[in-house]
Amino acid sequence: MATQIDASSEAAAATAAAQHTPMMQQYLRIKSEHPDTLVFYRMGDFYELFFEDAEKAARLLDLTLTQRGASAGTPIKMAGVPHHAVEQYLAKLVKFGESAAICEQIGDPATSKGPVERKVVRVVTPGTLTDAALLSDKSDVFLLALCVGHNKRGVASNIGLAWLNLASGALRLAELAPDQLGAALERIRPAEILAADGTIESVPAGMGAITRVPAWHFDIASGTQRLCDQLEVASLDGFGAQALTSANGAAGALLIYAAATQGQQLRHVRSLKVENESEYIGLDPSTRRNLELTETLRGTESPTLYSLLDTCCTAMGSRLLRHWLHHPPRASVAAQARHQAIGALLDAPPNAGLDSLRSALRQIADVERITGRLALLSARPRDLSSLRDTFAALPALRERVAEIASNAAALGRLEAALEPPPGCLDLLTRAIAAEPAAMVRDGGVIARGYDAELDELRDISENCGQFLIDLETRERARTGISNLRVEYNKVHGFYIEVTRGQTDKVPDDYRRRQTLKNAERYITPELKTFEDKALSAQERALARERALYDGVLQALLPHIEGCQRVASGLAELDLLAAFAERARTLDWVAPEFTDEIGIEIDQGRHPVVEAQVEQFIANDCALNPERKLLLITGPNMGGKSTFMRQTALIALMAYVGSYVPAKAARFGPIDRIFTRIGAADDLAGGRSTFMVEMTEAAAILNDATPHSLVLMDEIGRGTSTFDGLALAWAIARHLLSHNRCYTLFATHYFELTQLPAEFPQAANVHLSAVEHGHGIVFLHAVEEGPANQSYGLQVAQLAGVPAPVIRAARKHLEHLEQQSAAQATPQLDLFAAPPVVDEPECNEPPAAATPHPALERLLELDPDDLKPRDALDLLYELHTLARSGPADAQR
């Protein structure tokens, strides 16, 4: 019965296929193999899309949608793009999260019976980009696979991640708890995520294009074996991945998919890195966002820490900088080695100094991505010429590094890495023309002298010019037609052109080839014989050149690992040189590390803000076991958030390996950096501003350790005054008593400044400001002790709030202050007994009136003795006395 059903189904399919033309049958077969992908079907000089693909491409790419004929009774909708411009259209599709299958003609139209043979040679997806035209120079593109592991009860117990930078061949694995997935994806920022049907729901929204793959691709045992085969090892023990489970399953699915899109092996994926959470300083999504490491809060690329630090001379260095900023190592050993290398670069002699080194680095090509294309056999001629020129420049670069490497072990390691693979430079020099064409099909790629057969064929083609000149001279003399011309075009080949008024002089052996409005074009037996010989030589030369070029690519494959080593060394050298340039230009210093708990920053500056203003006020920051929490008060716009962020950024920069913007800095161990700064709601997630604030606070309270650095800015402001005050008080107490972490706690709740009385490990500092006339001057200096007011009305006035509103607010503020003075001190500790307020005795005689100190000071001075400067100083003094009152002056 089953056999009958299968037979009838096949017959029905055959009948349906017969209704289409042979070419459409070929297209539909290819399309059935790529149902969710736009198929770019090569037809001559164009890539055509049909049916639904054509409609979608026309909409996304702004193409003209046409309709030509019908197949099986259905109108054929078409849209096409020129083959030479396909990359720019692919780039647009990738930005929309779409994928495209590139279907090329692989058969010879002259010998094909029926449609020319075609096949899909590659699939371009958001996560598998390698072509330079599709990639951003300064950021990596990651393809990530996600595999959920379950316990015996069927509950998700861990999540395995495998992500690949196909352009470089870097493969990484990690296993983590389910609640850590969002933070990991935020850090990796994959362009495309592979997941099985049952796990797609685990992926947070907006994290990249999601591609469904069969669940069996994630089999753990198969994934482990596939990894071993890819890395050409018997066991993964050497990579620390043998004990992994779900991560190996994810890696298996990743490798299957990546190889399928490229249509070949991934020869450049020869190493593996297993990421461990304890290896790096933890930075959650909120911290990365609030510190503006690589993207501002407005979503722009500048001004950020990355944009400030990125003075790299190569794209490889810029990409490595982005990776280092998001992966600061916890161990200070790596940072110290980088600091040592920066110091050696700064102290180098002029002939091998920083400027000379960076000048040489500017001539270096993107070896990392060229190597990736080499491994995938998709490198273009100018990739190879750039690689050749880079390898030719390496000996001089190595000499410069060697002269200063004795003072830094890291530079010695890099100097050794910059040796080109043996024989690689010689092959590229002999094989590739000095200035090759962009594409092999254009010819002129293989250097003369590399292949005798190619040189002979080229000689035939290149001697055409002289033959045509000689023929033209002879024919003018023979026919008496002085303006006769012998020319060539790609459509009609070689021809003799005669103007219409001279056609009566044409000899009998001239055969008409083309008629124009004002001329006739002819061919002669002699010219036809030469044409056959010349065009045949040209075609054979191009075919020979294509074969030779493919041979060069194959010959370079054994050198892939050596090229990757060179690329890695160049990227790190470039980044260290950029760090040295920043340190010299911006007056940064090398930080120190200690095993003792503490953060000490002398005259620290915010690196990004300092670059945006004319003058920046430097400030100190000291945190240690006796001073774990700083309560920061002061006016709005006074610099509280800047001070907090600069402390975190200086710490981060130190562990990344950069010098830091300070007079001196010293750091103990840091395991994580948390920030709770700013206010923003999450409308898509259904969370209010206050809910977002409390969620971030909860993460800090649950995860911060004594080695964590915590920034808390105005916690509790998203709710009512007393609720917010109570929460802020309780959170600060918990950070001191339970987490015992380094904490910078900015607040406008001045009641919190009483906290140091209960916890000696807390201290008050404030950002100072002075009133000047009807305005306010922010001093941006951090001083010990609490602030005495917030200057909110003055800031509102600076912001342009209308004067009537300011006057009304000032009047209401006076009323509130009078009310507050008449009430008891608020009960801050929710579990303490209410404070006892002593009532004044009514029968006591009133105290004698005390003259106001400002008045006394005025009576003491002689106005005629005051100089202008003294008068200004006195004005400020009187202003302070007037605000303090008699009682304060006496204290």
Swiss-Prot record:
Gene3D superfamilies: 1.10.1420.10, 6.10.140.430, DNA repair protein MutS, domain I, MutS, connector domain, P-loop containing nucleotide triphosphate hydrolases. It comes from Burkholderia pseudomallei (strain 1106a). Coiled coil: none annotated. The keyword Cell inner membrane does not apply. This protein is involved in the repair of mismatches in DNA. It is possible that it carries out the mismatch recognition step. This protein has a weak ATPase activity. GO terms for molecular function: ATP binding; ATP-dependent DNA damage sensor activity; damaged DNA binding; mismatched DNA binding. Belongs to the DNA mismatch repair MutS family. Pfam families: MutS_I, MutS_II, MutS_III, MutS_IV, MutS_V. Keywords: ATP-binding, DNA damage, DNA repair, DNA-binding, Nucleotide-binding. ATP binds at residues 634-641. The keyword ATP-binding applies. SUPFAM superfamilies: DNA repair protein MutS, domain I (SSF55271), DNA repair protein MutS, domain II (SSF53150), DNA repair protein MutS, domain III (SSF48334), P-loop containing nucleoside triphosphate hydrolases (SSF52540). One of its GO terms (cellular component) is cytosol. GO terms for biological process: mismatch repair. Signal peptide: none annotated. This is DNA mismatch repair protein MutS.
